[in-house]
């Protein structure tokens, strides 16, 4: 069985929920404190043993490439000024993994974005990490899925429970059997209508997929939002070859919409020793 050493991070979206900030700035580069959100995702992949990462980008995304590239002039200035801590942070972001880029030429959905990286992946199993979800966990969320893949040899989809009122916002699984945190899946449903979801186990932006998924994506018809939906292709693959779901452990932060982004920023700031005391005092002064 081939080891999981490659990952895809889709980052071609327009980021319309954060306009006008994302008119010229990639949404993935918006920072949680002093680190862009996409770096948290790359760090998770690297901690999970991923060596090669392909980031699927689009127009106006050059800042992502610049961030993970070395900047010798900046490094020299920091070194000359004795700012060793900042220098270490800057260099760290360039050394996480081997990072490559491919452009999604049309905005045709997540499934289409994954297809854009087919040549990079070849005939290997691979991970997918979506940038809207930062997961804090002792064992990286995607590593938990990799462990299930190495045990079963089958594709694995990361899920977590959500309130029933929110199920229409996610891809949802209809579980068949349960073994601890692992599920066999009867079917996958992309954004079911309110009140029709088969469970409250939602797909949460972490996948380990076998290369056969590309064959299903190639023939996948447009689905929700008139886009090529990855969930729809996974559902078809599941009909031929069992796909598992795994309820991964960890605290998930939704940074794909404004309120979640603000909540995440506040929570991370409260974890920072240099900010906690003053921020706590400020929040109390608001008298909310």
UniProtKB/Swiss-Prot annotation:
Annotated EC: 2.7.7.9
- Output the InterPro entries linked to this UniProt entry: GalU_uridylyltTrfase_bac/arc, NTP_transferase_dom, Nucleotide-diphossugar_trans
Give, as in the UniProt entry, the pathway in which the protein acts.
Answer: Glycolipid metabolism; diglucosyl-diacylglycerol biosynthesis
**GO terms, molecular function:** UTP:glucose-1-phosphate uridylyltransferase activity
- Role of this protein: Catalyzes the formation of UDP-glucose from glucose-1-phosphate and UTP. This is an intermediate step in the biosynthesis of diglucosyl-diacylglycerol (Glc2-DAG), i.e. the predominant glycolipid found in the S.aureus membrane, which is also used as a membrane anchor for lipoteichoic acid (LTA).
Q: What does the sequence similarity comment in the record state about its family?
A: Belongs to the UDPGP type 2 family.
Write down what this protein is called.
UTP--glucose-1-phosphate uridylyltransferase
């Amino acid at each position: 069985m081939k080891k999981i050493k490659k990952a895809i991070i889709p980052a071609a979206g327009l980021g319309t929920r954060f306009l006008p900030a994302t008119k010229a700035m990639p949404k993935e580069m918006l920072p949680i404190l002093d680190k862009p959100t996409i770096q948290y995702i790359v760090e998770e992949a690297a901690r999970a043993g991923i060596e090669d990462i392909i980031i699927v980008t689009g127009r106006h995304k050059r800042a992502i490439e610049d961030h993970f590239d070395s900047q010798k002039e900046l490094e020299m200035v920091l070194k000359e000024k004795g700012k060793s801590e900042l220098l270490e942070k800057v260099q760290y972001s360039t050394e996480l993994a081997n990072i490559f880029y491919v452009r999604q030429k049309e905005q045709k959905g997540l499934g289409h974005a994954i297809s854009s990286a087919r040549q990079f992946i070849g005939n290997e199993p691979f991970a997918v990490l979506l940038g809207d979800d930062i997961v804090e966990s002792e064992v990286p969320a995607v590593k938990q899925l990799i462990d299930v893949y190495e045990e079963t040899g089958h594709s694995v989809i990361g899920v977590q429970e959500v309130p029933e009122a929110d199920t229409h916002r996610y891809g949802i699984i209809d579980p068949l059997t349960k073994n601890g945190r692992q599920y066999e899946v009867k079917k996958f449903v992309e954004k079911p209508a309110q009140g029709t979801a088969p469970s409250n186990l939602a797909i949460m932006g972490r996948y380990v997929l076998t290369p056969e998924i590309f064959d299903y994506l190639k023939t996948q018809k447009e689905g929700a939002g008139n886009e090529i939906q990855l969930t729809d292709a996974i559902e078809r693959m599941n009909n031929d070859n069992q796909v598992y779901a795994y309820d991964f452990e960890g605290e998930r932060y939704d940074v794909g919409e404004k309120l979640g982004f603000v909540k995440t920023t506040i929570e991370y700031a409260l974890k920072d020793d240099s900010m906690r005391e003053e921020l706590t005092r400020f929040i109390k002064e608001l008298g909310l």
